[in-house]
Amino acid sequence: MKIPEFKEYYQQLISTSSISSTDSSWDEGNAKVIHKLAQWCEDLGCEVEIEEIEKGKLNLLAKLGSGEGGLLLAGHTDTVPYDQGRWNYDPHTLTEANDRFYGLGTADMKGFFAFILEAIKNINWKDQSKPLYILATCDEETTMLGARHFASNTSIQPDYCIIGEPTNLMPIRGHKGHVANAVRVTGKSGHSSNPAYGVNALEIMNEIMFALMNLKNKLVKEYHNPGFSIPYPTLNLGHIHGGDSPNRICGCCELHYDVRPLPGISLDGLDNMLRDALKDVEEKWPGRIEITPLHEPIPGYECSADSPIVTSVAEICGQEVETVNYCTEAPFLQDLCPTLVLGPGSIEQAHQPDEFLAFSFIDPTINILSKLMYKHCF
């Protein structure tokens, strides 16, 4: 049996397309890449479980060693779609140029699994006392289906978890959540010369937007976490469309907005705040306002600054532990054990044409993962 080299792992991960999308014409599942990972993990001595959550949507859990506790290294195997016309390189070919690996998933984040496998190869596991787990999930880029399902159904109880999203190898112990809703107003169209014959959806939406802006100001005043660069929840009105002509009363209008709650603000609590903000408008215009989520809400996440994993990882990386404003699978895996986000590459490369991972991350990442394995599995 020939164990692949690091670059070969990377090449095969990138060349095996695993796009997830809410657009069915793009969505292709992750089965092929999961089965590749399964074979590699088995070749390195791991026990492997694969679970199909929905058709073509798979989670993998690999286990090396036995005992209680241990370390969970986690990541997602799906990528976003891409615009071929904006890429200078083939998204599904690992291209070496400018001291970088180019390709879809090099940074976000299929490439992380190549680092895990390479670190495993570099360690003598003879005196291992606690298990190492590897979790590879599906659909992080859309619904976070894989992480949600795993956290709700697994029986494993690791001591700590590291999620390998691109953080420039800076440890992350917290991030905000994300809630996005559509508000649809149905009015009654008519000729603009006689407003009494219609119900203007744009005018109702104006009342809704005013109420949401009041809530935005309330969130800024009432919630504060100094651990974040933007220390309050944000509310953004991101998209609006309504009407079709200046001489027609607008019959329909739709607004999309998002909220990024701080850790500690429950999703139910936030939903109640949003509904309370619009209560008066809904009572004034019964049956004309419909609110629907644009995706499953993601809660905020925070690992205690006093957790031993925070101190351990900060020492190994030689960097202070920070917080960020984007989302990961951490809120779900944090339910299992203290969880940090730490991985090679920059979040600025995520979802971008010519996504890349700089070669300068290779040796430090393998070194950090090896040290984490030694510290928490021996």
Swiss-Prot record:
Pathway terms, separated by semicolons: Amino-acid biosynthesis; L-arginine biosynthesis; L-ornithine from N(2)-acetyl-L-ornithine (linear): step 1/1
Q: Which GO CC terms are listed, alphabetically?
A: cytoplasm
Q: Where is this chain's protein located in or outside the cell?
A: Cytoplasm
Mind listing the UniProt keywords for this protein, alphabetically? Amino-acid biosynthesis, Arginine biosynthesis, Cobalt, Cytoplasm, Hydrolase, Metal-binding, Zinc
Instruction: Provide the residue positions that the database annotates as binding Zn(2+) 1.
Output: H76, D108, E165
Q: Which reactions fall under this protein's catalytic activity?
A: N(2)-acetyl-L-ornithine + H2O = L-ornithine + acetate
Superkingdom in the source lineage: Bacteria
The protein's Enzyme Commission number: 3.5.1.16
Pfam families tied to this protein: M20_dimer (PF07687), Peptidase_M20 (PF01546)
Give residues annotated as binding Zn(2+) 2: D108, E141, H351
Kind of enzyme, top EC level? hydrolase
Active site feature: D78, E140
The principal location of this protein is: cytoplasm
This protein's cofactor list reads: Zn(2+); Co(2+); glutathione
* Molecular function via GO: acetylornithine deacetylase activity; zinc ion binding
Bound how, and how many: what does the cofactor note say? Answer: Binds 2 Zn(2+) or Co(2+) ions per subunit.
**A GO BP entry:** L-arginine biosynthetic process
PANTHER family for the chain = ACETYLORNITHINE DEACETYLASE
Q: How does it assemble?
A: Homodimer.
UniProt lists the family membership as follows: Belongs to the peptidase M20A family. ArgE subfamily.
The function of this protein is: Catalyzes the hydrolysis of the amide bond of N(2)-acetylated L-amino acids. Cleaves the acetyl group from N-acetyl-L-ornithine to form L-ornithine, an intermediate in L-arginine biosynthesis pathway, and a branchpoint in the synthesis of polyamines.
Identify this protein by name: Acetylornithine deacetylase
Q: Which gene encodes it?
A: argE
